C-alpha cells in the first residue's frame, strides 16, 4: 500500500478562489470587504514568515489587511490598548495576534482581550467553549483546516479510533473536540502518556503535532490509517520535515499529509474563512 497524499496546497488554493469570488460579490452588492488586523510583536523570524503569508493571502482574496508591527519592548498595556482599538473599529472583522509573544506579555490575557466575535484564530475561551458544547462558531484554524482535509478523503469519520499526539491549546486540545464532534473515539497523548506506540498503532486516524522531526516511526502506523502531520521542522540542511517519518508511514497509511504543503496552507485558508464568517454573521 502506498498512501495518497492529501494536497493541502491545492485544497487551500481552491478555498481562496471561492473566497475571492464571495468578496467580489459583496463589493458588487455594495457591501464592504472583510477586514483583518494582523498584530506582530517582536522580530521572531518564523513569526515574520507566518505573518507575511497571512497578509499576502488577505490581499489575494480581496480582504482589507491592517498590519501592526510592534517592537519587542512593547508593553502588555500598549498591546491591549491596540486590541481595544481594533475591537471598536467597524472596518475590522478579525483580529490576529501572532504567537508566541515576548515573555513579559501574558498570552491568555491578550487572547481574552480580543472580542469573541473578532477572534478569527478561534483561541478565545468563549469560542473553544462553543466547540466543546457542540455549537461551534469561530473555530481554531489548524484543527478546522485539518477537518477540511479529512473530508476530502471521503472517509466517514464516525466510529473511527482517532489519536492526537500533542495537547497544545492551539492544535491538540481543540483537535480532540473537533474529532469528537465528527463521531470519532478520541485519545489525546501528551508528555505523560504511557505506551505511546501501542496507542498510535491502534489509530484509524492519527494527528501529530509535537514539533519534533520524525517523532513517530512509520512502522507504528496502522495499515489503512489516515495520517495528519502538523509538524513543520527545519533540519540542519535547511529542508523541512514533519513529526512523522513520511516515507515509512506512506507504506502503511491510506492517506497522508506531506510537509510542506499539507496542513500549513489550510491554517491560513481557515483563517480567511473565519474572517468572512465573522463579517457575514456578526458585522453585516
From Swiss-Prot:
Reactions accelerated catalytically: (6R)-5,10-methylene-5,6,7,8-tetrahydrofolate + NADP(+) = (6R)-5,10-methenyltetrahydrofolate + NADPH; (6R)-5,10-methenyltetrahydrofolate + H2O = (6R)-10-formyltetrahydrofolate + H(+)
Keywords: Amino-acid biosynthesis, Histidine biosynthesis, Hydrolase, Methionine biosynthesis, Multifunctional enzyme, NADP, One-carbon metabolism, Oxidoreductase, Purine biosynthesis
Sites where the protein binds NADP(+): 166-168, 232
Top-level lineage group: Bacteria
SUPFAM superfamilies associated with the record: Aminoacid dehydrogenase-like, N-terminal domain, NAD(P)-binding Rossmann-fold domains
Pathway: One-carbon metabolism; tetrahydrofolate interconversion
GO cellular component: cytosol
Membrane-traversing stretches: none
Function: Catalyzes the oxidation of 5,10-methylenetetrahydrofolate to 5,10-methenyltetrahydrofolate and then the hydrolysis of 5,10-methenyltetrahydrofolate to 10-formyltetrahydrofolate.
Family membership noted in the UniProt record: Belongs to the tetrahydrofolate dehydrogenase/cyclohydrolase family.
Subunit structure: Homodimer.
Record's protein name: Bifunctional protein FolD
Organism: Shewanella sediminis (strain HAW-EB3)
Lineage, uppermost ranks: Bacteria, Pseudomonadati, Pseudomonadota, Gammaproteobacteria, Alteromonadales
Gene coding for it: folD
